[in-house]
From Swiss-Prot:
Has antimicrobial activity against Gram-positive bacteria S.aureus ATCC 2592 (MIC=2.5 uM), S.aureus ATCC 43300 (MIC=2.5 uM) and B.subtilis (MIC=15.0 uM), against Gram-negative bacteria E.coli ML-35P (MIC=30.0 uM), P.aeruginosa PA01 (MIC=2.5 uM) and P.aeruginosa ATCC 27853 (MIC=2.5 uM) and against fungus C.albicans ATCC 2002 (MIC=5.0 uM). Residues 23-44 form a propeptide. The lineage of its organism: Eukaryota, Metazoa, Chordata, Craniata, Vertebrata. InterPro entries: Frog_antimicrobial_propeptide. This is Temporin-LK1. It comes from Limnonectes kuhlii (Kuhl's Creek frog).
Amino acid sequence: MFTMKKSLLLLFFLGAINLPLCQEERNAEEERRDGDDEGSVEVQKRFFPLLFGALSSMMPKLFGK
């Protein structure tokens, strides 16, 4: 009986440790996935003003105004 309690206690302990580790890994993966979306938005924010600035400086040269 004592060995059965001991092994059940060990299983409970290992399960209790394993659960938070899995949750941390899942949260890190979700943050990594969410971070990719934010990075692409930031790249778009940086790219479009540069593109519009370059086009506005080239337009007068192209049309001779």
